[in-house]
């Protein structure tokens, strides 16, 4: 059985992206999401809470809850992703599950959404009370090229930095690195939290800078690179020579 080829064209929503983490009908928090540039838009991490005005927060919360009502998703954990465009919030996706940033939420507010979800499932009363209010940021690490990972280190140095909640590597030396333009490209992450947005940003950057690696291009890429260097004509500045 063969189907005729079809193309799906979707509008690109220009603007910062946010994610509302929800339990039942309560918006727990809203994060600001970071993505790599086109064409893949690989997710790079997020910050809780997002730097929003009261009106922006209220608008995103209202739109998110209206999505749940429209879809009949009033029970358990959900997360709604939106982009804030010139005409206001545009919904990107609605997910009837816990989001992937439960650790970041716990670092920011002291709320363990996994535990609270289990309480809901077994019939106990959940508790979404915020035990503290910090700025928490997660940053995912992505390699800059394909090839064989020669070495990678610095996770212990990063983890020892005050304010770093966790620093973890997913790969080991001699691992083949082939970027696919999605979540499978991640080789590690760092998570940090502090009472200050500027301080958290500085801690995360220091932790990321502490983690280093070396990747040797695959043999074919090495040959192509050498050939391109040999065949490239020398450029003579205008007016000289």
Region spans (language model):
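Gly/Ser/Thr-rich active-site loops/lids in small-molecule metabolic enzymes
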Residues: 103-119
């Amino acid at each position: 059985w063969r189907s005729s080829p079809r193309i799906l064209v979707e509008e690109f929503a220009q603007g910062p992206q946010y994610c509302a983490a929800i339990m039942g009908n309560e918006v727990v928090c809203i994060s600001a999401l970071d993505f790599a540039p086109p064409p893949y838009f690989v997710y790079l991490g997020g910050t809780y809470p997002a730097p929003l005005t009261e009106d922006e927060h209220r608008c995103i919360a209202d739109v998110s809850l209206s999505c749940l009502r429209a879809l009949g998703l009033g029970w358990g954990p959900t997360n709604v992703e939106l982009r804030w465009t010139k005409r206001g919030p545009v919904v990107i996706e609605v997910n009837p599950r816990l989001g992937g940033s439960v650790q970041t939420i716990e670092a920011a507010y002291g709320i363990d959404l996994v535990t609270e979800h289990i309480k809901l499932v077994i019939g106990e009363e959940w508790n979404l009370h915020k035990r503290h209010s910090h700025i928490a940021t997660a940053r995912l690490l992505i390699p800059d090229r394909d090839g064989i990972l020669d070495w990678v280190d610095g996770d212990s140095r990063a983890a020892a930095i005050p304010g770093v909640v966790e620093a973890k590597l997913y790969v080991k030396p001699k691992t083949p690195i082939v970027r696919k333009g999605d979540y499978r490209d991640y080789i590690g992450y760092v998570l940090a939290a502090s009472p200050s947005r500027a301080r958290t940003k500085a801690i995360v950057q220091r932790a990321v800078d502490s983690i280093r690696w070396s990747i040797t291009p695959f043999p074919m890429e090495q040959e192509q690179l050498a050939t391109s260097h040999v065949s490239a004509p020398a450029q003579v500045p205008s007016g000289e020579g």
